[in-house]
């Protein structure tokens, strides 16, 4: 009887831990999507004050490109620096990002606005990579990864729509976004406490088990490595193609927004949230 009770308690604890990880995953990624898209919207509007629509699109291309560089830079930081050092750098990046965001509201020229945007989005790329890294490790092996990612994207879009529709003032929107940077950063720090303390801990255990079962021969490992490389290569190609398509469409929509033909912060933005949910279900 006691064993049955303990078993049920253990199952309940695991379910609660699983639900907690799922909430952290959605909260962290949803918060990042909200911050990134919201700041991009503000940057476009601020840049439109000092240049024409073509200049805004060109500047947007620069900041999005540099955010990708920041995304890649995070991998180098994790590879060459200690975990605690990376943790401190991420905290500093969040604080500096808030300062740069508020700096966009100064009386700036096109070149200074672009410089602030480049610095800001490089740091956002680093923070975004950290958010994705933590979430991926948090849900390693989960079969619901796609659904949770879709839900996180939809929540991020909904938050941006609500922030823009309710506040009606860019300063207020910026303050809300600044608060969200600290909030999702705090959630990321909390989520890291749920991760294994040492990298490769689970991998090492899996390798030992495979060695004992006789399935981890040299040939098996080579085949697994080849299969992994093919999967990674295919994933990179797909992501690159989708990013290229999305960025081209984004440029076209931004051109219409800056020229006054439409406000992309209003209800059409909700289509993105719906597409994210649908992609997660598929």
Where are these regions (language model features)?
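Pair of pore-lining "gating" transmembrane helices in MFS-fold secondary transporters
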Residues: 13-48, 52-56, 228-250
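Central cavity-lining transmembrane alpha-helices of secondary-active solute carriers
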Residues: 57-78, 274-279
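Intracellular juxtamembrane helix-capping segments at the cytosolic ends
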Residues: 125-139
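Glycine-rich segments within core transmembrane alpha-helices of 12-TM secondary carriers
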Residues: 141-164
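Loop-to-transmembrane helix entry
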Residues: 50-63, 257-275
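Hydrophobic core of transmembrane alpha-helices in multi-pass small-molecule transporters
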Residues: 111-127
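C-terminal ends and interior cores of transmembrane alpha-helices
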Residues: 93-107
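Symmetry-related core transmembrane helices of the 12-TM Major Facilitator Superfamily/SLC fold
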Residues: 173-190
């Amino acid at each position: 009887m006691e064993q049955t009770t303990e078993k049920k308690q253990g199952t309940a604890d695991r379910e609660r831990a699983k639900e907690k990880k799922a909430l952290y995953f959605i909260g962290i990624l949803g918060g990042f999507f909200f911050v990134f898209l919201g700041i991009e919207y503000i940057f476009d509007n601020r840049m439109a004050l000092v240049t024409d629509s073509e200049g805004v699109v060109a500047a947007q291309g620069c900041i999005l490109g540099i955010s990708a560089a920041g995304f890649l830079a995070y991998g180098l930081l994790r590879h060459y620096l200690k975990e605690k050092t990376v943790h401190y750098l991420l905290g500093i990046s969040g604080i500096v990002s808030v300062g740069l965001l508020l700096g966009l509201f100064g009386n700036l020229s096109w070149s200074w606005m672009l410089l602030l945007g480049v610095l800001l989005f490089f740091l956002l790329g680093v923070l975004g990579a950290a958010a994705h890294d933590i979430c991926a490790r948090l849900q390693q092996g989960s079969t619901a990864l796609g659904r949770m990612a879709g839900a996180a994207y939809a929540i991020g879009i909904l938050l941006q729509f609500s922030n823009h529709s309710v506040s009606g003032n860019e300063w207020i929107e910026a303050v809300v976004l600044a608060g969200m940077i600290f909030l999702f950063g705090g959630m990321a720090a909390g989520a890291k406490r749920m991760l294994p303390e040492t990298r490769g801990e689970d991998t090492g255990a899996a390798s030992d088990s495979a060695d004992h079962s006789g399935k981890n021969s040299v040939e098996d490992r080579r085949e697994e490595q080849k299969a992994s490389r093919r999967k990674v290569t295919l994933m990179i190609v797909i992501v690159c193609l989708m990013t290229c398509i999305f960025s081209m469409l984004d440029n076209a929509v931004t051109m219409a927004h800056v020229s006054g033909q439409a406000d992309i912060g209003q209800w059409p933005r909700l289509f993105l949230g719906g597409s994210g949910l649908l992609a997660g279900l598929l």
